[in-house]
Amino acid sequence: MAKAKKPVKEEPFENQLWKAADKLRKNIDAAEYKHIVLGLIFLKYISDAFEELRSKLLAGEGEYEGADPEDKDEYKAENVFFVPEIARWSHLQNNAKLPTIGKTVDEAMDAIERDNPSLKNVLPKVYARGNLDPTNLGGLIDLIGNIAFGDAKSRSADILGHVFEYFLGEFALAEGKKGGQFYTPRSVVELLVEMLQPYKGRVFDPCCGSGGMFVQSEKFVEEHQGRVNDISIYGQESNQTTWRLAKMNLAIRGIDSSQVKWNNEGSFLNDAHKDLKADFVIANPPFNDSDWSGDLLRQDGRWKYGTPPTGNANYAWIQHFLYHLNPKGIAGFVLAKGSLTSKTSGEGNIRKELIEAGLVDCIVNLPAKLFLNTQIPACLWFMSRDKTNGGFRDRKGEILFIDARNEGHLINRRSKVLSEEDIQKIADTYHKWREVDGEYENIKGFCNSASLDRVRELDYVLTPGRYVGLPDEEDDFDFNERFTTLKDEFEEQLKEEERLNALILENLNKVKLV
């Protein structure tokens, strides 16, 4: 009797979509191709949302009785972008096989911007460029147009938003180091948001990249049965192409991005939200940034706890975040791990002042390999303007240290992610510690609530490992995973050695002896 075949696990549709889109990329650089693909996904989203409302207006039933389907105000009233005829997806799909399709898409983007001022200078107009083959562009339009998006709701916000987010992550992986400039790994964003719990109030990210922190904040509110309208977002980004991605990413989610600003001077030199006092600050600023114009800001009023060094912006970012917190506000952000110990150019003194002012609430040591753009070890800082209450227990004179270096799992030899269980474990530890009736306990090797006196004893060093100690079971690690990782790294080094030797030999052969 023949054995029954095991059912083949179907590949997630976003995976299939990515592979198909990647095949059409040909020789186009990932950094350029992302704007081509994401722009089309956005166009499909707004066209679908427009057509859905237009069909209701055409039917003219109930609340839509007597409505004019060509009246832009009808769409504006329902937070739907007006899409002129030449920009509707049906028009693009009908012209997808023509050699002029690139020009047609660019004209569609222009037309949408003209009719929707909030999208001015946001959409990519790159489709008529010579390096984009019209046949491949037509194939991409067919691919995106033929996705089975289900019912209206999932088609617009959920599915297309998910595809957009998934593609952002895949493009970040494809770009490697540069990808990290516009994308924070999803599991890191989820951890920050889960720990901060932004149920209600103003959420601010002064280096917002493609807007992932905002998207996750809105998801958090929805998942906890809150009202999305209870939070408002404020952001700033200095890279215009990244800002455009953020505006599209947020629009697909139906999130108001009117307060997400761009200027090329950046948050330090040209603060777009000078008077903002936020309930939550959530951010992933550039690690150890030496090019932040610190020499022009020596006397800046934000440096209440000490003037940051010109060669490293870490402590400038910390004080910028604090400046924008309201008296009950909480900040959570990613920094290079060196920020926990550095004493260079007065950084140790600033850290001491922050600790003595009772602002540092919790420090989390992150696992290696979470970030695409750097191998620099990273950590999370959580700072609170009011540790005496702020809706929680009085935590004055205490700091929680969490060492999460052993959490997470490898998805390939270079990248790790935190699972939902990892995120919940870390977030729950913080919540139990700060809540009035939280059942918090120190766990050797993982977490410790340290007194201010203990931090003073250790000279204001904030490395969690110094406080949590070693776990009782030191040999409890996955040998196979550790061995595989080391083997892969060794093989990479051998390949690099071979490449460099060949390069040296090639250059030596070019040298002509006189």
Q: Where are the predicted features?
A:
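Conserved Class I SAM-dependent methyltransferase catalytic core
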Residues: Q16, K23, E32-Y33, V37-Y45, ...
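Short, contiguous acidic/charged loop-to-helix segments that flank catalytic cores in large enzymes
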Residues: N27, W292-N312, G338-E347, P367-N373, ...
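Switch/connector loops and helix/strand junctions flanking conserved nucleotide-binding motifs
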Residues: W243, L269-A272, N288-D291, T341-T344, ...
